[in-house]
Amino acid sequence: ARHHANEVSSTNAAFILIKKLLTEDVYKDLPDKLNLVIVPMENVDGAAIHYELQKEHPNWKFHVARFNSLGKEFYYEHFQQDTIHSEAMGLTRIYDRYVPDMIVDNHGVPSHEWEQQFSGYTSPSYKGFWLPRSLLYGYFWYVTNPEYKDNYPVNKVMEDVIADKIAEYPEMRELNREWSAQFEKYAHAWMPKLFPANYYKEMINYWIPFAADPNHRLSLI
């Protein structure tokens, strides 16, 4: 959790999970079935920056605290043994030691991103910054190599489980429906290629095929 240090809720979620695992009887046999590693705060320098900034403005987004002390998105430094960004070695060492079947990278939404329209602001990677709010959506990056064909149906099951769990919470479901209507009215209806909408159980999921590449920045590829 807390790879992006201004996304505080990811640390909170990690601690809530730890509490549930330690206090609820339904999970008491879990240690006999799996190895679970929880990292509540990966980006400690960014968290220190965020802590100082929030003293003056506790409700601001503080995008400057998203990265590490050098202003680096050190995600790209994972699995780079010669990196100068030592915090990136945390995940690398965990991966080498445990060879996990699954990694959950908790993020969070600290506040709304609001960019003044036609102001000249540009962010090529995230067209969603154009929107003050967005519905819940998912990305499935799946490998197309024949030897990994069993991964695709696993992802489809995950798609169902996630959508069904979100639908169990009436407030989240109603907010998602509201934001879906806004997304349709102001984005997808006007620019369907830029804002595609592949709806599935009241969510939008994007399926991105890739050939397996051991040098890809995403370990799942």
State where each predicted segment sits.
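Short hydrophobic beta-strand that contains or immediately precedes a catalytic carboxylate
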Residues: A1
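Active-site/substrate-binding loop(s) of hydrolase catalytic cores
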Residues: V8-D150
